[in-house]
A protein has these predicted regions:
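Periplasmic c-type cytochrome electron-transfer domains
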Residues: 1-122
């Protein structure tokens, strides 16, 4: 999902945040396609350490909570991304060490020069 130089595939995917889509249809609100229910655009991971809260609805305040979701909080639905349901198992199992290493890597994607440039501050 988070590939290429931008660390995104620019696609819409269901990442298992919701299982009830009655209030939030995702991409299908625009496309009207049933296969788009619960799908949201995959964001870039550039500067991800400084862009929380995370997910389309701001559900997670920290990167740690995002990884915990992917490890043990994924909700199943008909449009769930197949990468999150391998061999009938939901989520992406990660050890504590893998989570720490992944967060350390994500922090390296922060462009300190960009975020400190006054021309881009609000």
């Amino acid at each position: 999902c988070h590939a290429t130089a931008l660390f995104t595939d620019q696609r819409y995917r269901n990442n298992g945040i919701l299982s009830d889509f009655s209030l939030d249809q995702g991409r299908s609100e625009v496309s009207t396609l049933p296969e788009d229910v619960g799908k949201f655009r995959v964001p870039s991971l550039r500067n991800v350490a400084v862009t929380g809260p995370y997910m389309h609805n701001g559900k997670f305040k920290t990167l740690e909570s995002v990884l915990e979701h992917y490890a043990s909080g994924v909700k199943d639905s008909p449009t769930l991304d197949p990468l999150l349901k391998q061999n009938g198992q939901l989520g992406v199992p990660l050890t504590s060490g893998e989570k720490q290493a992944l967060i350390a890597f994500l922090q390296t994607l922060t462009d300190e020069d960009f975020i400190k440039d006054i021309r881009f501050q609000q």
